[in-house]
Structure formats: C-alpha cells, structure tokens
C-alpha cells in the first residue's frame, strides 16, 4: 500500500473541527442575529481544494437558495494522482459532476447570519480515467453521498468554507472560498 503524502485525515478533521468551533464562538459574540446565510433566489459561487486518499481535488460549484434554509446546487471537481500497483506505476484522473441539496441551520439554531452550518446529500457521476493495463479498482459510475460543513462570511459577499463528505468518490474534506451574489 502506498503511503499518503497528505495530511493525516484524522488530524486534519480534529484541527478543522476546533477551528469551526472557534469561528462559531467568535462570530456569535461579535455579530447580531440575522435572517440566514443565503436568501431564496440568491446564488453563491464556491471554489477550492479538497483532501482525500485519491489526490487533491480542485472544485467549483454553484448553490441556489430555493428557501431561506435550503439550497440546491451543482459542482464540478477534478483530481489527478499517481499510484504504484503490483510493481507498476499508473496515473489516474477522476472528474466528478454532482448535484447537491443542503439544509442550512442558521435560523433553527439561532446563530448569526455570517455563520452558515449546513448538511445535505449529493449525487455525483464520476468519470475515472486510468492508465492502460491497470488492474486495481476504479470505474466510472454514480455515487450517493452526504456532507456536513460550515461557512464563515467575513463581509456581505465573501466567506471561507470547510466541508466533510462521505460515502462516494468525493469523500474527504474540502476547504475554499464562497461568494454570495
């Protein structure tokens, strides 16, 4: 088994959870209560990097507010990585096209509108390209997954985002920027 060159996922999750708690406590004490992080009919653009056992995905996505507490969206991501399997080197590329829906807990939890805590489901079609002759696992197909995340807006438009997901090929974590239109 090839040893990962990336951050240990359990350490990363522990540190990012601490960061989210700190952001929550800071924003709760500084900002007044608001209506929610995204309004019905509002668009939000997201982009960033991910962390997984299958390379570092780069992603871009768009969310649309269908209700003050619910968004639907789409995302495109791509990752490349190299692997040694049975003594031979292989290159892989995975592209994921997905749709998602999230429930945003700001109103329910009565937290400031600049802090967005959400959870939801996603359905993605992944396209797995690999070197000729590769005998390991890897095929294209559909994947159903779940995500939970947090977003901190430091002004009316810009925010930072941290998300954890699982149960499909987009499993892992993501960190990036969000822009509300």
Ranges and model annotations:
Residues 39-53, 72-80, 121-125, 157-168:
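Transmembrane beta-strand segments that form the barrel wall of outer-membrane beta-barrel proteins
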Residues 63-133, 152:
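Gram-negative (and chloroplast) outer-membrane scaffold detector with strong preference
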Residues 99-101, 170-181:
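Outer-membrane beta-barrel "beta-signal"
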